[in-house]
Amino acid sequence: MNSETFSAGPKSAPAPATLTIASRESRLAMWQAEHVRDALRKLYPACDVKILGMTTRGDQILDRTLSKVGGKGLFVKELENALADGRADLAVHSLKDVPMALPDGFALAAIMAREDARDAFVSNDYASLDALPAGAVVGTSSLRREAMLRARYPHLNVLPLRGNLDTRLAKLDRGDYAAIILAAAGLKRLGLEARIRALIDVEDSLPAAGQGALGIEIAAHRSDVAQWLAPLHDPHTALAVEAERMVSRALGGSCEVPLAAHAVWRAGELYLTGRVSTTDGRRVLSAQACGAVMTAADALALGRAVSDELDAQGARDIVNALLAGSQVGKGDA
């Protein structure tokens, strides 16, 4: 149960002269990269911090859902290539879009303080999910949200929604959907909080592992970069996210599976909930655990406890069936 988060150790590296941040080119991704750039400039005023904007394969494929074309790795592969060949020193990601197991040679050097982890209901005509009439079209980009909608609102027509945040809002505004479900964090970061009609309680729509948090990835051998990024690391968020990602990793989860995991701190203990559903929402498994989490090993153990309980309820059967089905779909495409 190794942690995927880099430990920079006690030594300090000389202040950097230059740093290059790899980022997707969407407005939200660039905001996130600029947020990290500005933080680094404050830490290292003499450092020339640049952003290398890149278009990923995930940004190019807009006519199919992620679960049918290769998953979350489509958003990070090009950025990792830039880390590997030295064009970039670090890459900034929405952590929920990072595969649960990083490729060999890469590590998460810092996880920043989390924004709102909840899902947001966005609509021009309706105040909440409960207000939508039968047959109303709701757009979502994830199987996790789709399963939630089908379980709680079987009378709604749930359809895929691809594209970056601005594209999704444009599709709503032109009338393709009565409502869409988005991550609240992205809307808030771009100053679009006014578009949120309602925030969905985590009990009703448990967030994806890492939702609302930014992760900074590096090449694993770059201990110097890890040390420079250490001041941006938020330990409480990192431990929570480590536990969440362990739930998904232990069960073999991906964007091809409606799997959610969310941890919150209460009175010094970490409370972790995991949930696995069938895509039609007819079967929903849930498990919880809590404990005094002080180290990454503690967080991993908590995540393992929740995944073991879900496994005992039959979660792995759901995951394996969905993954087998997705592979058939890819072969037929």
UniProtKB/Swiss-Prot annotation:
The modification S-(dipyrrolylmethanemethyl)cysteine is found at C255. Pathway: Porphyrin-containing compound metabolism; protoporphyrin-IX biosynthesis; coproporphyrinogen-III from 5-aminolevulinate: step 2/4. Its EC number is 2.5.1.61. Keywords: Porphyrin biosynthesis, Transferase. Binds 1 dipyrromethane group covalently. One of its GO terms (biological process) is protoporphyrinogen IX biosynthetic process. GO terms for cellular component: cytoplasm. It catalyses: 4 porphobilinogen + H2O = hydroxymethylbilane + 4 NH4(+). It comes from the Bacteria. GO terms for molecular function: hydroxymethylbilane synthase activity. The keyword Transferase applies. Belongs to the HMBS family. HAMAP family: Porphobil_deam. NCBIfam families: hemC. The porphobilinogen subunits are added to the dipyrromethane group. Tetrapolymerization of the monopyrrole PBG into the hydroxymethylbilane pre-uroporphyrinogen in several discrete steps. Monomer. This is Porphobilinogen deaminase. It comes from Burkholderia vietnamiensis (strain G4 / LMG 22486) (Burkholderia cepacia (strain R1808)). The lineage of its organism: Bacteria, Pseudomonadati, Pseudomonadota, Betaproteobacteria, Burkholderiales.
